[in-house]
């Protein structure tokens, strides 16, 4: 039986790796061995950072809410505590969006939270 070297499959795999590393620096986009290492690391970072993005976005929302709350005379913690006491169930993503795009509505929500906190 003749030996099969698998040249076509290898060539396709190499082309795929080199296509994925297009834009990488130096030999990381042209030499297969270096490109493969670069691709594995890049994919690993992409996987980890897709998960890290969730926390990053939450931190951004909290920062925005805190800034808007301070403009209304409350701290972030006081606002969130007041919302819980008032029974207003709005998540941080919506609150942050409201703080940027609809400041009047955010001010009304902050006023209700402050009133609930005062009682």
UniProtKB/Swiss-Prot annotation:
Matches recorded under Gene3D superfamilies: 6.10.160.10, Ribosomal protein L20
Alphabetical list of InterPro entries matching this protein: Ribosomal_bL20, RIBOSOMAL_L20_CS, Ribosomal_protein_bL20_C
GO terms of molecular function: rRNA binding; structural constituent of ribosome
Superkingdom of origin: Bacteria
GO biological process: ribosomal large subunit assembly; translation
Keywords linked to the UniProt accession: Ribonucleoprotein, Ribosomal protein, RNA-binding, rRNA-binding
Record-linked SUPFAM superfamilies: Ribosomal protein L20
Any Gene Ontology CC annotation: ribosome
Protein role: Binds directly to 23S ribosomal RNA and is necessary for the in vitro assembly process of the 50S ribosomal subunit. It is not involved in the protein synthesizing functions of that subunit.
PANTHER family in the record: 39S RIBOSOMAL PROTEIN L20
Family to which the UniProt record says this protein belongs: Belongs to the bacterial ribosomal protein bL20 family.
Protein name: Large ribosomal subunit protein bL20
Source organism of the structure: Dehalococcoides mccartyi (strain ATCC BAA-2100 / JCM 16839 / KCTC 5957 / BAV1)
